[in-house]
Amino acid sequence: MIILLQHNYETVGVLADWQIRSRCEGDSPMVEPFVLDLLNPASLDVVLGPYIMVEDPNNFDLVRVDISDHTEDNPWLLDPGEFVLGETRETFNLPNTISAQFVLKSSRARAGYDHALAGWADPGWAGSKLTVELKN
């Protein structure tokens, strides 16, 4: 889930759903693809992209794994203690007045997942996907 913050010269505030939507639809979308069903009252859910990087237990190298054929009915399982790197399906084009922070949804935290705290995107961060670090 991404929380988007509006920066004015004196204040910072969380964007409401209608503000996120207005900035994600149109000619210069802040997040693309924008899926309306993923919009929450003050945040936007993001989707893991088709590839993750998994640590090889034999030599600690990262191995690219294609998870694109996995679904809710056929999930790719993150084993206890396992750590993976992934990236969002979404590409971000934040204007100079908006920053974003990735936080784990509480339902995933209750399932035992954790993520590193590197999920910050500065104002003006554009043309990139967000790297996410997940651990079970």
What residue spans do the PLM features occupy?
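Non-catalytic terminal segments and appended small domains
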Residues: M1-N136
